[in-house]
Regions:
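Core subunits and conserved enzymes of cellular information-processing
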Residues: 1-217
Length: 217
């Protein structure tokens, strides 16, 4: 790839981060839970006077990056350290997205479900763009890949186990922090887990070819 194409792909990846973060913001605003990978940060952000969701996402992503370094050791590629500034950018985009959608009323349950569905669609679009960019993995996917490669396991199976582990950890944190009450992890989390992958596949079919043509020009 030429330097120009590489630059275009990184710009595309940053754009994908914005849409992914906006999708998270929509689901968060719906108050029915967020995607599994964001569920731990979401629970931690529910504490009064604590950090915002964006800040907790930065911290969570940095923990996952550290996990990659520990698992891969000498096999960890230095280029993957770019995940750190990109994690900060994702956290900022998430808080900005929450500000953007903050005016939308969510009093009714139907409206909350709508927010979750819209969030999943936007998140799916963002993830599909990041796949098309093909420059660097987000910290969650990279962490799963590190485990799968090291343990010689199927990526999809490890991803499912990782998502389930995130939800279980979020539930445990919620019970411990909020007097045995489940906070921040609800049916929206399950819906996101089941439907985000489908949205990504749909957008991949629609956008992969034109996006690749665009960045290759």
């Amino acid at each position: 790839m030429s330097k120009k194409e590489i630059a275009k792909r990184y710009v595309l990846f940053i754009i994908s981060l914005f849409f992914s973060a906006l999708g998270v913001a929509f689901t968060k605003h719906g108050e029915l839970g967020v995607s599994p990978i964001s569920s731990v940060a979401n629970v931690l952000s529910c504490t009064k006077g604590g950090f915002s969701l964006g800040v907790w996402l930065i911290i969570w992503n940095c923990v996952l990056i550290l996990g990659q370094i520990i698992i891969l050791r000498k096999k960890f590629q230095l280029i993957q350290l770019l995940q750190i500034p990109l994690s900060f950018l994702f956290g900022y985009f998430t808080d900005f997205g929450l500000w953007l959608v903050g005016f939308i009323p969510v009093e009714s349950y139907i409206m909350r479900l709508v927010m979750v569905v819209v969030g999943i669609v936007i998140l799916g679009f963002g993830v599909s763009l990041s796949v098309s960019a093909n420059v660097i993995m987000n910290s969650g996917e990279a962490f799963v890949k590190a485990i799968a490669d090291t343990a010689n396991k199927n990526f999809g199976n490890v991803k499912i186990a990782f998502d389930v582990s995130c939800v279980v950890l979020a539930l445990i944190l919620s019970l411990l922090m909020f007097d045995f009450t489940i906070v921040g992890t609800r049916e929206g989390t399950v819906i996101s887990a089941l439907c985000t992958g489908l949205a990504v596949k749909l957008f991949q079919r629609l956008t992969n070819e034109p996006v690749n043509r665009l960045v290759s020009v």
